[in-house]
């Protein structure tokens, strides 16, 4: 048993990053192996780690146990003290654990005014800490979603740089990438990544004070602090965090008092080498209604784009999601769905749920391409058409948050002229329409106007990285 567990840990070290080994595998303690029942019992230090290991690593441990014992083995996880069976000693070193009371105290201190220091008292034996309760307190205060981890984040060309940066931040918070600014369209995995960072840091067991907050909630916190005249408490809490995760910061637009308070929190945390991670739907300099001081601070760290997933990545996402649902999905079925639905991860997952529900309600035990065609016929009728100028106009208008009617109008403000020129450029690049035909579809404009727009955007694309990125995103959205 002892020899097996040492071999198991060694094998997992070859498959998993060091941080995961330290956070999840080394804290486990093998208790016993029941030869008759082929059951391996393993203890986890608290409920938080137990649930996580059972969900993310049990299949790997069971596979290694089956290989070692030459038979299928069931691995069960339990908390210390739930059984009288003796523990098996391990030669593998384990990290020093932070006491649960210290974690609880740190969390409480982060959210409440510090009470007066109590008078010294004689040392007394401490009661056994409620590990599961402490883990739950950390989780509830952090507002992290424990389902969003690095382990179940599908990586491809569209997000590999963002994932690499996120891993680096999780392992070395508050150093070179501070703040980390992730931007991209809806449903591309920004929220998943920042939760993964928070979960990894909490799991490392160092008692870090973490808070995930959507920008709207932060605004609400500021308003409540103002109404209750409790800004000192508000500042004490946010300034004391080790990791602050702000999602969709574009919602700070026009909220001057919120931006002012966030600026103070930002300055305080960075000065203490505490990590800040921000997501947005656009590049920092393209944020409207945001104080220039904040935009300057955002640019001082690392800014990484997450783009729409390419075909191979979309297939991998579908296969991973189907596996998590316990449903076998042939690769050709995943390929069919991925080929026709191209915009983002949420759309893919929604389509998969629709297919699974259709198959279940109609008694289809096996997923096939025909089942997908039936289940997704409404979605496919929209996505199957060729790229048209009308589709380009709508996609560009949605991206720049203007009306489609602005594409045909004679108005020329900058916030309309640029999107219109971008749409003309894409119409020339992605359709077979002639310049006069494109001009007609843009409110009867002359072909020389279209030619001017095409040349202007083409030249600017070669010189401006932000515009090139925008065009790349639009092209991939339109043609997959």
Swiss-Prot record:
Residues 71-142 are annotated as: Domain II. Belongs to the DnaA family. SUPFAM superfamilies: P-loop containing nucleoside triphosphate hydrolases, TrpR-like. Domain I is involved in oligomerization and binding regulators, domain II is flexibile and of varying length in different bacteria, domain III forms the AAA+ region, while domain IV binds dsDNA. This is Chromosomal replication initiator protein DnaA. Residues 143-359 are annotated as: Domain III, AAA+ region. Transmembrane segments: none annotated. It comes from Bordetella bronchiseptica (strain ATCC BAA-588 / NCTC 13252 / RB50) (Alcaligenes bronchisepticus). Its main location: cytoplasm. Residues 360-480 are annotated as: Domain IV, binds dsDNA. ATP binds at residues 187, 189-191. The keyword Secreted does not apply. Residues 1-71 are annotated as: Domain I, interacts with DnaA modulators. Pfam families: Bac_DnaA, Bac_DnaA_C, DnaA_N. Keywords: ATP-binding, Cytoplasm, DNA replication, DNA-binding, Lipid-binding, Nucleotide-binding.
